[in-house]
């Protein structure tokens, strides 16, 4: 009888601890990922498809940009890349950008860009104060 009572008390304690942890986790607010898009934009559509599985874990807001003004960066290649604050450049796909691990010891990437017109920005998952901008081809 004592053995059963001891196990049930231990189970009750661990269940109560999980309950408290879940209650405190529900009070934390996640940063909202802001996706600036422009119609038509194939890279923006690709980003939305990549983000679809994460909708329930990471909230994001779709912000439409007006206008068709072209933006050019003299040093950027024709495909998206990421530049760190120290000036290093990483040639990455959108999937690699979204899963970039800031704990790898690398400088945290600052911007993503390429030589095209419309742009959109992604606020990174692990670093909510960091924004990455894409300039997709038109």
From Swiss-Prot:
Bilayer-spanning residue ranges: none
According to UniProt, the name of this protein is: Glutaredoxin-like protein C5orf63
Superkingdom: Eukaryota
Q: Which family does it belong to?
A: Belongs to the glutaredoxin family. YDR286C subfamily.
Chain intervals with Basic and acidic residues compositional bias: 55-64
Disulfide bond residue pairs: 41-44
InterPro entries listed in its UniProt record: Glutaredoxin-like, Glutaredoxin-like_YDR286C, Thioredoxin-like_sf
Q: Which stretches does the entry tag as region Disordered?
A: 55-88
Q: What are the UniProt keywords, alphabetically?
A: Disulfide bond, Electron transport, Transport
Point out the gene that encodes the protein: C5orf63
Q: Name one Pfam family in it.
A: Glrx-like
